[in-house]
Amino acid sequence: MEHQGTGIFHLGAPFLLKVKQWVGWSWTYLWGFWFLLVIFLLYILRAPLRLKENMNLVILFLNTLTPKFYVALTGTSSFISGIILIFEWWYFRKYGTSFIEHISLAHLGPLIGGGDNTAPNSSQNVAECKVWRNPMNLFRGAEYSRYLWVTGREPLTYYDMNLSAQDHQTFFTCDADETSSNSADTIMLTAWRERDQEKRINAACRAYECDPTSPTALILLAEEKAQTITEAEWYLKQALKTSDDLIRNGASTNGDGKEDTIHRKNTNVCVYIRRRLAMCARKLGRTKEAIKMMRDLMKEFPLMSVLNIHENLIEALLEVQAYSEVQQVLAKYDDITLPKSATICYTAALLKARAVCDKFSPEVAAKRGLSPAEMAAVEAIHRAVEFNPHVPKYLLEQKSLILPPEHILKRGDSEAVAYAFYHLPHWKQVEGAINLLHCTWEGTFRLVPYPLEKGHLFHPYPGCTENADRELLPVHHQLSVYPKKELPFFILFTAGLCSFTALLALLTHQFPEPMAHLAKTSLGWISAPFSLLIQKVEDFFPAHILHQLTRI
């Protein structure tokens, strides 16, 4: 019996689902036919229902009403509409959506729309707003501080610098520093926790005086005290000598927990120094040297892929226009199992666009259609724009750039700023790439009409990016928000209805006779098509058929 009940339930569920879908379909497409059918039945049954007599009574009642009644009626409706408008506006400001629209979509939509009840995995619906270290972050002393001196604007937020302080404590300190025989390690343990920049630099100077070969002290001086990239490179080269010795001496650890901790710290320090040295070489124009250093670093420390050194390599390869080598890097890192980034997606789009953009013409494409290569380029652009929709406005120079933050949010405005800051010249040096992007990027939004609910090639766009980007980007930057929060239709409709009825009430109160004449004229215009339709129906059907129908 239990199995039979289960079988009946499984057989009944598809039937009920089909009935529900049929009802939803009928409400979607047949409401017009039903409306005409009701009008036709009312016309046929006008004699039994005494519609003409009842209509005359209604007209007589309306004729006895004074203008003051209409003023009171419109005033009351305006008052009610105003209350609805205020409530809708409060609800929209608090929850970001219209109350009426929310109720319609959440409760009425499933009843009459026949929507799909299958809910995807919550882990795919809710994207975690994870903050990542910017692989292309600048030097504070040589770049960020100079920007502050020139403009008087803070390039970094407190939240961003606080995240960097946490990263520095993770990379450059360990528990063994508290009991280290080297006083420089103890001083730097305190220096990395210091929030004030001047105090950090002073602490690093004291550690440098105690031990001129302290790698972490030299790193802090290179990052924050050095006023030029050349000076920062000098500090880092001094730190690398000691760091390499520490790595070689600690390679043969006997498995002791303390020694392993120190070795992990020394490894982090060595990787960081070599990476920053490669970035210094890139900034000073020695791009080929920087490429070699990055390749060696990725080869020697493959487990450090979490630092996204490949993004530094891609940018350097684009600088020397080594597009085939860039394609090889993308083939390795543009994998479905690896986290995506704006650098990966937009570089793939740039390489696809490079093959066709020099001969691309929107007029010609509109006439003959897109070739397979052009279609592949457009699809790559759409894929990149879906991943991060903020980037195109920076590449098209519709928004001004600022210095990139030290941390970015994937798919957010902070990542777009960080990407465009370095890659805008690479798009410009490919002739026609900017033009192709300009002609095609907005087509992405037709593929993703509801980005917060459902994506096309990626998960739905996370709704938490706006708040996180506001914490990462400075106040003077105009934040790019996606999708744009436009006022819902119900709020606009309510506001228009409220304003229109209030205007009618005012005009009726000031000019009662002209407004009454205008109302009668308007009603005559509105009823004229219906009167003509009724006359056509009476002419079409024979009189005896209508007479027999009224006798039913």
UniProtKB/Swiss-Prot annotation:
Coiled coil: none annotated. It is found in: Membrane. The keyword DNA repair does not apply. The keyword Transmembrane applies. The chain crosses the membrane at residues 25-45, 69-89, 487-507. SUPFAM superfamilies: TPR-like (SSF48452). Signal peptide: none annotated. Its main location: membrane. Keywords: Membrane, Transmembrane, Transmembrane helix. This is Protein ST7 homolog.
